[in-house]
């Protein structure tokens, strides 16, 4: 016979028969108006049927085939066989496809049949609930009669098992015992045996627990006794340590007291000495007090003397300031004089340049005149043609090369005069010193050599230009003209015999000796008209170009000054110079560019020009390794003459001839880095780095001069000394 609790458990295991389900059914029975079945709306049903048809007809054919229905296998929880059964049920005519009307009609019939089945199941549930309600009411009446007997039996069981000592709440066990007694009576004895075993084990565990608690209490008591013993021992040790510490402290205090007594006695003795010293100092102070009056009187005298000295110092300061102002005025005047001197040097240099150009034009005129006279001479001496040819061939072996200065100026030479005799005359000429600088003059001398046999050519005078190497270059050609006029002028002629040799043929005597000093040279008037008056430069620097022969110094200077290149130029003899004006940082800078001869016999002249140079340019040939090896010798000459106080420009020329290079760029850079030089590789032929290198050197010279001017020592007024006595 089932109890209410048993019905609740069994109903909870069956779906649709739980408390909620039974309650809902009873509520429906109590309210029969809620049992009305709400039918779905007809339009909603038709709409759902159409949506399901469109889902099946994904291709939009207007009908559904069996394959379309099988595609829903993945979307619906139905197997293929079930889907085929649905298709067969909807296909009433059996034509193998479903139209929208057939699908909607079949779907509505299926829906209505499901609703009818649901109503029948609902009726069955209502009937079952009514039966359960009747059964429940009968069970409650039986429980009322049996409660008293079951409670007595359960209490007897608990007393027999001794559960009161183990369990505090017997409700759970009572409920389980009653459930088994009602539902499963045959299992009740097993349950009671299980309870007997469990309670026996619990009783045993309880006894073990009591034993463990007793052992634990004994252990705690023993531990407390041990702790108490340790505490007493610690108290005894602390007491003994305290007594020892007090004993040591007493001894230490006594020793400290004795030490302090000794120090006190020493301090008393020191105090006595200080008292004696104080008495002595008081006596000295009294003596010093007497001296104080004397010192005051002396200080008064010194104060008066100090005032007089201060007034004298002030007068001296005023005089020193006046002297300083005069010194500054003199410095300004000296600076102005220096600038005027530089401008004068520049103007004289320009005049010398124009004089040189005029002389060149005069030489051209004389050459033309000599050619005309030579033609007349050839007609006159046709009979002696063979003898003259032999004489010219003998002179070809002793020809000399024309220099850029001495060669371009008229260099009078005899017909039979050799190059060695020429050099001997030049260097044996007396050197002249000038307070201004370079002394250049023209000297006409008679040639002692004889003319050609039978030609009747008299002795001629040659034009000589001697350059002083002792002082600054300041030509004095404009200070009164020449002592002797230009009387005779030889001509060097290049006679090409199949491009193999040159012959120097002497020109006949020109009877052009005037009685008065020479005036303007031929073509000089035209030169003054063609040349534009240059602007006054702000700075003037002298730069000396040195290097082995044939490295291209003259061609480089011609490229700088004339912007052209002339191949096959003759070697420089002696010294030549040019003037180049450049603009550096908005300032006009005039550069005197001195071209020196590279031959060994002219090096003594070149080295003398280093002393007054502002800068030096050392050049070598990129295609000749020997010229680069000579650079160190040139640098040694510069260092011996001027030390390291002037900048040096290292130039590697003939960069245009890269195929024949023998000196790598790295060697030049390394040499420049070791000796602190300015390094450029240039080309006189193409003009590459010609202007750039010169501007770099000019800018460096200008910066050095600005630094020297700014570092000029300014003498300031001396600081006024304070008097010692106020």
From Swiss-Prot:
Q: Which Gene3D superfamilies match?
A: EF-hand, P-loop containing nucleotide triphosphate hydrolases
The disulfide bonds in this chain are none
A GO term (biological process) for this protein?
A: activation of store-operated calcium channel activity
Mind telling me which CDD domains this protein's record contains?
Rab (cd00154)
Give the region (Switch-II) as residue ranges: 598-614
User: What does this protein need as cofactor?
Assistant: Mg(2+)
Source gene?
Answer: Cracr2a
Which InterPro entries does the entry link to?
A: EF-hand-dom_pair (IPR011992), EF_Hand_1_Ca_BS (IPR018247), EF_hand_dom (IPR002048), P-loop_NTPase (IPR027417), Rab (IPR050227), Small_GTP-bd (IPR005225), Small_GTPase (IPR001806)
Enumerate the SUPFAM superfamilies for this protein: EF-hand, P-loop containing nucleoside triphosphate hydrolases
- Name the PROSITE patterns for this protein: EF_HAND_1, EF_HAND_2, RAB
- Please name the Pfam families in this protein's record: EF-hand_7, Ras
Q: Which GO terms describe its molecular function?
A: calcium ion binding; GTP binding; GTPase activity
Q: Where is this region: Switch-I?
A: 567-575
Q: Which UniProt keywords apply?
A: Adaptive immunity, Calcium, Calcium transport, Cell membrane, Coiled coil, Cytoplasm, Cytoskeleton, Golgi apparatus, GTP-binding, Hydrolase, Immunity, Ion transport, Lipoprotein, Magnesium, Membrane, Metal-binding, Nucleotide-binding, Prenylation, Repeat, Transport
Q: What is this protein called?
A: EF-hand calcium-binding domain-containing protein 4B
Residues binding Mg(2+): 554, 572, 595
Please list the residue ranges that the record marks as compositionally biased, kind Basic and acidic residues: 1-10
């Amino acid at each position: 016979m089932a109890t209410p609790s048993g019905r609740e458990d069994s109903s909870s295991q069956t779906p649709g028969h739980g408390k909620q389900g039974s309650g809902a059914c009873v509520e429906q029975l109590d309210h029969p108006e809620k049992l009305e079945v709400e039918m779905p709306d007809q339009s909603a049903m038709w709409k759902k049927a159409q949506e399901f048809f469109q889902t099946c007809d994904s291709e939009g054919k207007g009908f559904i085939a069996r394959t379309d229905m099988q595609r829903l296998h993945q979307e619906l929880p139905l197997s293929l066989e079930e889907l085929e059964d649905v298709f067969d049920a909807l296909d009433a005519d059996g034509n193998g496809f479903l139209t929208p009307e057939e699908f909607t009609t079949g779907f509505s019939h299926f829906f209505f049949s499901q609703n009818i089945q649901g109503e029948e199941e609902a009726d069955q549930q209502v009937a079952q609930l009514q039966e359960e309600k009747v059964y429940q009411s009968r069970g409650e009446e039986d429980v009322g009669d049996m409660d008293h007997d079951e409670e007595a039996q359960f209490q007897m069981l608990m007393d027999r098992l001794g559960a009161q000592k183990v369990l505090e709440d017997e409700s759970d066990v009572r409920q389980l015992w009653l459930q088994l007694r009602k539902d499963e009576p045959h299992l009740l004895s097993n349950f009671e045996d299980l309870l007997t075993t469990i309670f026996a084990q619990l009783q045993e565990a309880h006894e073990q627990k009591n034993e463990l608690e007793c052992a634990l209490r004994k252990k705690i008591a023993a531990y407390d006794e041990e702790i108490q013993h340790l505490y007493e021992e610690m108290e005894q040790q602390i007491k003994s340590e305290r007594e020892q510490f007090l004993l040591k402290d007493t001894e230490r205090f006594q020793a400290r007291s004795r030490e302090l007594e000794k120090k006190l006695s020493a301090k008393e003795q020191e105090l006595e000495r200080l008292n004696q010293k104080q008495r002595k100092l008081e006596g000295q102070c009294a003596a010093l007090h007497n001296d104080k009056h004397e010192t005051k009187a002396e200080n008064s005298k010194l104060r008066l003397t100090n005032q007089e000295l201060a007034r004298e110092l002030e007068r001296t300061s005023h005089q020193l300031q006046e002297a300083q102002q005069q010194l500054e005025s003199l410095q300004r005047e000296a600076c102005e004089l220096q600038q005027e001197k530089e401008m004068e040097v520049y103007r004289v240099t320009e005049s010398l340049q124009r004089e040189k150009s005029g002389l060149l034009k005069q030489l051209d005129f004389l050459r033309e005149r000599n050619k005309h006279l030579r033609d007349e001479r050839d007609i006159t001496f046709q009979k002696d043609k063979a003898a003259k040819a032999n004489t010219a061939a003998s002179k070809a072996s002793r020809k000399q090369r024309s220099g850029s200065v001495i060669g371009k100026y008229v260099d009078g030479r005899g017909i039979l005069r050799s190059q060695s005799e020429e050099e001997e005359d030049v260097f044996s000429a007396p050197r002249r010193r000038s307070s201004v600088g370079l002394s250049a003059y023209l000297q006409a001398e008679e040639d002692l050599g004889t003319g050609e046999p039978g030609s009747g050519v008299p002795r001629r005078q040659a034009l000589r230009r001697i350059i002083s190497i002792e002082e600054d270059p300041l030509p004095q050609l404009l200070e009164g003209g020449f002592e002797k006029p230009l009387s005779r002028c030889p001509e060097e002629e290049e006679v090409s015999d199949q491009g193999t040799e040159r012959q120097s043929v002497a020109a006949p005597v020109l009877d052009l000796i005037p009685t008065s000093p020479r005036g303007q040279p031929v073509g000089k008037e035209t030169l003054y008209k063609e040349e534009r008056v240059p602007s006054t430069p702000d700075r003037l620097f002298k730069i000396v170009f040195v290097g082995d022969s044939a490295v291209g110094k003259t061609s480089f200077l011609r490229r700088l000054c004339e912007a052209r290149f002339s191949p096959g130029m003759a070697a420089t003899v002696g010294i030549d110079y040019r003037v180049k004006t450049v603009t550096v940082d908005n300032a006009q800078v005039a550069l005197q560019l001195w071209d020196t001869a590279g031959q060994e016999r002219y090096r003594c002249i070149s080295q003398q020009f280093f002393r007054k140079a502002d800068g030096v340019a050392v050049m070598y040939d990129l295609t000749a390794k020997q010229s680069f090896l000579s650079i160190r010798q040139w640098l040694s000459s510069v260092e011996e003459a001027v030390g390291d106080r002037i900048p040096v420009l290292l130039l590697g020329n003939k960069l245009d001839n890269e195929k024949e290079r023998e000196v790598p760029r790295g060697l030049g850079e390394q040499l420049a880095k070791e000796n602190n030089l300015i390094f450029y590789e240039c080309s006189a032929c193409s003009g590459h780095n010609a202007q750039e290198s010169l501007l770099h050197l000019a800018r460096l010279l200008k910066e050095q001069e600005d630094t020297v001017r700014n570092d000029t020592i300014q003498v300031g007024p001396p600081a006024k000394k304070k008097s010692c006595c106020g």
